[in-house]
């Protein structure tokens, strides 16, 4: 199987998010890279499902809460940005302060 660098990046995000979700299911609090992976995967999959940029910008703030992540992670995570593929093309999705 041959993947482009872009496809490799998305596969890595998906795998990292899956690993982070399994850790969260075991009761562990997520670190910064794990939190970014989970939120980014949510945005990529939402775009694939046909949701709008505006919907994803709102729902991206509901993926994780302060209780899901290690202390200090919400303060380190100001924005999450990803270029997601929508039915009408690729668009940049930005979620400001994703962990309220």
From Swiss-Prot:
It is found in: Cytoplasm. Its EC number is 3.5.1.5. Pathway: Nitrogen metabolism; urea degradation; CO(2) and NH(3) from urea (urease route): step 1/1. It catalyses: urea + 2 H2O + H(+) = hydrogencarbonate + 2 NH4(+). The keyword Methyltransferase does not apply. GO terms for cellular component: cytoplasm. InterPro entries: Urease_gamma, Urease_gamma/gamma-beta_su, Urease_gamma_sf, Urease_subunit. GO terms for biological process: urea catabolic process. GO terms for molecular function: nickel cation binding; urease activity. Pfam families: Urease_gamma (PF00547). Keywords: Cytoplasm, Hydrolase. Heterotrimer of UreA (gamma), UreB (beta) and UreC (alpha) subunits. Three heterotrimers associate to form the active enzyme. Belongs to the urease gamma subunit family. This is Urease subunit gamma. It comes from Mycobacterium sp. (strain KMS).
